[in-house]
Amino acid sequence: MVNIRVQKAPESPRTMEVGEIDTRAPFQSVKAAVSLFGEVAVSKQRSTPRRSRLSSESVCDKETQLMLVHKEFMKIKQKLDNAESTRSRALDDLSKAKKTMEDLSNKLETVNKSKQSAIDTKETVQQREEQLEHDKCHGSPPHHHELDVAREQYISTTVELDAAKQQLNKIRQSFDSAMDFKATALNQAAEAQRALQVNSAKVNELSKEISDMKDAIHQLKLAAAQNLQEHANIVKEKDDLRECYRTAVEEAEKKLLVLRKEYEPELSRTLEAKLLETTSEIEVLREEMKKAHESEMNTVKIITNELNEATMRLQEAADDECSLRSLVNSLRMELEDLRREREELQQKEAERLEIEETKKLEALKQESLKLEQMKTEAIEARNEAANMNRKIESLKKETEAAMIAAEEAEKRLELVIREVEEAKSAEEKVREEMKMISQKQESKKQDEESSGSKIKITIQEFESLKRGAGETEAAIEKKLATIAAELEEINKRRAEADNKLEANLKAIEEMKQATELAQKSAESAEAAKRMVESELQRWRQQENVQLA
């Protein structure tokens, strides 16, 4: 500082000699001293608050940015919670849909079992009808009770088939509702996945912003450390200036004492006056220096407070950053878990859909086989109906022949009755003749007894007459027996033909009803097959659209 003072002081006109003491004032004026000692301090003082102001403003900006980022992060966290809740709801809906699908599959199995049991009962009824037909063909008497039981079984099987159809329609409706419910659940899961993707993108952006904020905070820390270093340098320079100033004042006082001793009193007075003036100026300068020092200390306190606040804010920002980083890591782990669970669910869903599709294809194959079997059964029933019609035609012909034979037998019976009546009339005539002959014989006997003359008949004539009467009686009895036997046989044949005709008509009606029911069941099964195939096709299209 002495060198600076010597450079800035104006040179004296006289030349300096060896051994001569410099009696010039160290400062020309208080203003020069203030300008000398205050330039650096004022410049440093002015630059330091500006830098501190800039650093505090940047810290405030960073804090506001951190607050905004934290708010955005909380919003994204809330969205993630909402997405997780929607995902859980979608999973619950999927589990409910799975349960309904299992219930529907169980119901379908029960319907198939009931249908199979109805088909088995139908087969047993058909076998029973065939057995009854065989018994009818072999002439065994009809079992009306067994026919009634078979008819009731057939009616019960038809009722079971109708109930199975109604249950199948209900199952189909519940299946449609379950498919709609499943589609809504899949849509919700897709929306949740999209929300998760959007939120993951936002989380990545926030992680980038947090890394940028971290870099900015690091730069702020470096700037704060630099400011502290500059402040320490400024304080050190001020201390050095104070020491230089003290040494300069001490040297000036020493020089004044030496000058007072060596020089004249006038010169000493002038020097004392100058010294007083300089001391007053020095006091003023000290006062100003003290004020400057106090203001500088105040600014230093303000800067230290601001730096402390900035460090606290930086620490809070670092803590927030750590919490945000841990939250981001946890969210990333949750996202990974969610992705893994979603992939597992998709894989399980695909496997379940494949298994269900294979089961449905097998069920369709079984249904098609059952339909083919029912068609063949319907064709067989039609063939049996045709055979029954042919048998009925033959039975009609037999009944017509029996009717013709009965008419012929009636005609023969009428002829026999006429012959019997003629024989009876002839017998009556013979009896009357015998009576007349006997009366005549008696009258002749009486006349002979009275007149003494006798009419004699030979034994051969009497035997021939007696034999003729017996033969006529035997022939009449024989003809009557043969006619009664023929009438009994004709009545039996007529009753058998009527019974066979009635049984065949009943069997034909039952076969017609059975064929109609078989045709209806085959048509309903075909319609159910078409509906199931259309439902499967629609379901596959929906699955393809959802997968796309």
UniProtKB/Swiss-Prot annotation:
Residues 430-448 have a biased composition (Basic and acidic residues). The keyword Coiled coil applies. Keywords: Coiled coil. Disulfide bonds: none annotated. Pfam families: WEMBL. Residues 71-544 form a coiled coil. Residues 430-455 are annotated as: Disordered. InterPro entries: Web. Belongs to the WEB family. This is WEB family protein At1g12150. It comes from Arabidopsis thaliana (Mouse-ear cress).
